[in-house]
């Protein structure tokens, strides 16, 4: 993955509803979910969901599969793993990120 693709993927996920949709699709596995079911589970209007799915699809993070009258969406696990690999290689020097990096310390103010 190159930096342009990584930025595009991260930008697509940098919005609450889109991140929730992506998390739901990852949890649903390779079969994915119908658009109506995604909207119902997350309480998102169909028109809003359509906008978010378009953004995630353009970033390559989701795939759509038409079946009969419905569109089924699934996470693109290859793209997700490529993004995780890019972050690990380029942000953590190829090593697992240290636990200290994931914690925050409280600052003392004078």
Label the predicted regions.
Residues 1-5, 26-27, 77-110:
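Amphipathic alpha-helical dimerization/coiled-coil segments
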Residues 4-5, 9-45, 67-79:
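N-terminal helix-turn-helix DNA-binding core of bacterial DNA-binding proteins
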Residues 18, 51-52:
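Histidine-centered divalent metal-coordination motifs
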Residues 40, 57-58:
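Alpha-helical residues within the helix-turn-helix
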Residues 45-46, 52:
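Short coil turns linking two alpha-helices in DNA-binding domains
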Residues 49, 56, 73:
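Divalent metal-coordination and catalytic microenvironments
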Residues 65-67, 97:
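Conserved catalytic-core motifs of GNAT/GCN5-like acyltransferases
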